[in-house]
Structure formats: structure tokens, C-alpha cells
């Protein structure tokens, strides 16, 4: 997987023993991430869609590192392949350095005080393996969180809004297809996903 990441190539699927159990998948992800020398610029919550968690019989999502070389600016292109699963609209948060001095428990009530800015993001989701579909949450978690690239939008100073019920849509300009979504399908809401990552 590290070779596939560094060389931007697809490899044969890794053995199921690394993906069927989320704990094994997490250990593999952490090991692979430790072999990447590029700067870590953030973290993402993955597998946050409640229907997916229920289908895969998992109780909570996972998190993974976002490396600097995987972050794109608006207008840049992304190469996709048959192992690309799709794209997701995300909410990104910029966290104040004070958070790292915090010794208390992160809750839904206090998580907001550590946020300085928020921004829209688009994540390109997929594997670095020659496989498709999702049988286990570990399929995603083990493969660098299934994060291929991150497109970061303009950041805005954080203010409290009803982030738990924001509608959004993505349009494919070439085909005209429109996909609608809502933040209420994301592990209750994006702030709860952030609380999970920070905890």
C-alpha cells in the first residue's frame, strides 16, 4: 500500500484478514501512514454515513491522516480509475492550537470553542488496490482511509449555524447529473464527526 501511495499505482487487493476486522485495518493504516514522510496537514473522519455504518455492522467511523501532497487547490485536475469510488462533499474545520493543550473531554458542547475557521471540501474517495465496492469498513480504513485527494474551498471565520441540516448538491457539468445531499446524514452532523476525530 505504501508503494502504491508513493508511486500512484494500483496493486492487487490486500488479504481480507487486514480489512475484515476494523482493529486490524486501523493498525495497518497507522503503520502505512508512518512510512509516508510528507507533512500531515489534517485528519478526516471516514465511514460517517449512518446507513453505511449500520449495513457494515459498525458502531463508529474511523479517522485517517491527510497528507499535504493530497490537498488540491480549486481548478486542479485529478486522475481517476476503476477503483475510484466517487466524491463526497465535506465540511472542513481549522482548529486552534489551544486544542493541543486541552486536558478535558471533548464534547458536542465544547468542541466549537476550538474552531477558528470552516470551509467546504470535496474528497475524492477510492482505493489504491484493484478492487471495487465495500464489504467491510476496514476496506476503507486500511487503504489510507480511502482518501485519494482533497479539494479545499475558501475558509471562512467560524460562526455557529445549524450545521446539522444543510442541503447541498453536486452537478456533473458534462452529463448534467445532479446529486443531492444533506449534512444530517453524516454521523448525526459534521460537528459530531469533528468531536470523534478530536477525541
Feature locations, PLM:
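Catalytic-core "active-site belt" of small-molecule-metabolizing enzymes
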Residues: 1-195
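Glycine-rich phosphate/ribose-binding loops and adjacent secondary-structure elements
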Residues: 199
Amino acid at each position: 500500500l505504501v508503494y502504491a501511495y508513493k508511486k500512484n499505482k494500483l496493486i492487487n487487493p490486500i488479504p481480507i484478514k487486514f480489512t475484515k476486522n476494523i482493529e486490524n485495518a486501523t493498525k495497518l493504516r497507522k503503520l502505512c501512514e508512518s512510512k509516508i514522510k510528507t507533512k500531515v496537514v489534517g485528519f478526516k473522519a471516514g465511514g460517517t454515513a449512518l446507513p453505511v455504518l449500520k449495513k457494515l455492522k459498525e458502531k463508529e467511523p474511523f479517522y485517517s491522516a491527510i497528507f499535504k501532497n493530497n490537498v488540491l487547490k480549486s481548478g486542479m485536475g485529478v486522475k481517476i480509475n476503476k477503483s475510484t469510488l466517487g466524491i463526497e462533499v465535506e465540511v472542513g474545520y481549522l482548529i486552534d492550537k489551544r486544542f493541543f493543550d486541552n486536558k478535558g473531554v471533548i464534547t458536542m458542547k465544547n468542541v466549537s470553542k476550538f474552531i477558528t475557521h470552516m470551509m467546504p471540501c470535496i474528497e475524492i474517495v477510492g482505493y489504491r488496490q484493484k478492487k471495487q465496492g465495500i464489504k467491510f469498513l476496514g476496506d476503507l480504513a486500511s487503504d489510507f482511509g480511502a482518501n485519494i485527494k482533497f479539494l479545499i474551498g475558501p475558509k471562512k471565520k467560524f460562526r455557529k449555524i445549524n450545521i446539522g441540516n444543510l442541503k447541498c448538491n453536486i452537478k456533473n457539468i458534462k452529463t448534467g447529473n445532479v446529486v443531492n445531499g444533506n449534512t444530517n446524514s453524516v454521523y448525526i452532523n459534521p460537528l459530531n464527526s469533528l468531536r470523534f476525530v478530536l477525541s
